[in-house]
Amino acid sequence: MLEKLIERVLFATRWLLAPLCIAMSLVLVVLGYVFMKELWHMLSHLNTISETDLVLSALGLVDLLFMAGLVLMVLLASYESFVSKLDKVDASEITWLKHTDFNALKLKVSLSIVAISAIFLLKRYMSLEDVLSSIPKDTPLSHNPIFWQVVIHLVFVCSALLAAVTNNIAFSQNKAH
């Protein structure tokens, strides 16, 4: 009797994630607002914007879109996996979610982080002259911010590769059984 009560209480705690999922949907609203603000800024300066600034603005919008997609993916998968099935939604609308297990979600998140990091580095590359001109010539490599941004990006890439290899090994072992 006590065991069943404890199990029911523990299982019911999954609903504590529901408010967090709702709060994450507010993050989407904020990202949408920032996206529209950046788009408006870009469009309102269309006649005077340089090609470099246009590319940087476009990369910023792509970055925000990736981030919004990442938030949505984690939000829906978390709700579906831990809180409740999304059975009120047309199943054809979320077919990807039905085939997304925790390992696949980790891989998608890792790849999204790599893409976001790559876009950030590309934006830095577009303004490389400004960044390098602000660094004294005798500065050691370890004090160069671009060096560390590339190192962090490579860590993200290696993490995503390791996650993919681990997922592939685990999937092939499960398939063999």
Swiss-Prot record:
InterPro entries the UniProt entry points to: UPF0114, UPF0114_bac
Pfam family, one: UPF0114
Subcellular location: Cell membrane
UniProt superkingdom: Bacteria
Organism field: Helicobacter pylori (strain ATCC 700392 / 26695)
Keyword Cell membrane tagged: yes
Transmembrane segments: 15-35, 54-74, 145-165
Top-level taxonomy: Bacteria, Pseudomonadati, Campylobacterota, Epsilonproteobacteria, Campylobacterales
Name of this chain's protein: UPF0114 protein HP_0189
Annotated GO CC locations: plasma membrane
Keyword tags: Cell membrane, Membrane, Transmembrane, Transmembrane helix
Ranges in a coiled coil: none
Family: Belongs to the UPF0114 family.
Membrane topology: Multi-pass membrane protein
Entry-linked NCBIfam families: HI0507 (TIGR00645)
